[in-house]
Regions:
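Active-site core segments that coordinate phosphate-bearing ligands/cofactors
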Residues: 1-173, 178-276
Length: 276
């Protein structure tokens, strides 16, 4: 899994008690473990850092594809009125409005299942948006629900590591497209995992940046210099980034959302069985 190692390097999360999350069209989290897990979990893959430390990985097939589809729908609406958009600006505005939504998304629910998810037992998926007549249906809650949904399956897997296995993580580093809009994906991830999340200036660089750093390490390291020491001293020293602690209200709101998601998974089952 080449992307795993390069993602760890790109976020300087190769030391124990660190973790990183790569979030784009798919999403995966990697946490460097202090010890082996107590048992085998089908939902958790075990990999290693480039220098051999044990890592628990949670991989999910879906993340931002459904959000991208909705943003394109808004673009088409604007174009009917003769408007043209810079897509980065459109994403920024729509992501940012999510921060004005209710912590629990006003009762809205989204499933971003473009494909199946082994984490929740689905071989195929159907993107769905669901609300009740009493739900608070507005743009802020709508965008917030879709951003929450991008992390919903990851949350199920990470709860195994953080809650069942009591894995210690001091900080999660985020990178990938979900984090390009400053403070939005970061704050929602912090709420979902109830863990501090940092995003560096290189957050949008992803695996290619990690590959370059590994090549630099192999070419320029001092004798017996460990990878984490090299990254700390020669790459990320002075690197600007932002750290965000979870907001307790958002944590409570995300927990309400994820319980609603798990309780209503039969909706997804019915959709995959009947919508062929």
């Amino acid at each position: 899994e080449g992307d795993a190692g390069t993602g760890m390097v790109a976020t300087n999360s190769v030391a124990k008690r660190t973790g990183n999350i790569s979030a784009g069209t798919s999403i995966f989290a990697m946490v460097v473990l202090e010890k082996e897990l107590s048992k085998v979990y089908p939902q958790i893959d075990l990999v290693t850092t480039p220098d051999g430390a044990l890592v628990g990985m949670v991989h999910c097939n879906n993340c931002t594809s459904d959000i991208n589809a909705w943003v394109n729908l808004f673009r088409e609406f604007g174009e009917m009125y003769g408007l043209t958009f810079d897509m980065n600006d459109l994403f920024t505005k729509l992501y940012s409005v999510a921060l004005k939504g209710d912590p629990d998304c006003g009762g809205l629910l989204s499933y971003c299942y473009f494909s199946g998810e082994h984490m929740t037992g689905f071989e195929e998926g159907r993107p769905l948006f669901v609300r009740s007549p009493e739900s608070k249906f507005n743009l802020a809650n709508f965008m917030r629900a879709n951003l929450y949904a991008s992390l919903e399956v990851l949350k199920v897997g990470m709860d195994i590591l953080l809650k069942e296995e009591k894995v210690a993580v001091d900080e999660i580093l985020g990178h990938g497209g979900l984090f390009k809009t400053k403070g939005v994906g970061q704050s929602i991830l912090a709420a979902a995992l109830d863990t501090p999340v940092s995003v560096m200036e290189t957050a949008g660089e992803g695996g290619a940046w990690g590959i370059a750093l590994l090549a630099s390490y192999m070419n320029n390291k001092a004798e017996d210099e460990a990878l984490d020491d090299y990254l700390d001293a020669k790459v990320f020293a002075g690197q600007k980034g932002t750290k965000m602690d979870p907001d307790p209200k958002d944590v409570e709101g995300y927990n309400a959302f994820i319980e609603r998601f798990k309780k209503t998974l039969p909706i997804m089952k019915a959709a995959t069985e009947t919508m062929k």
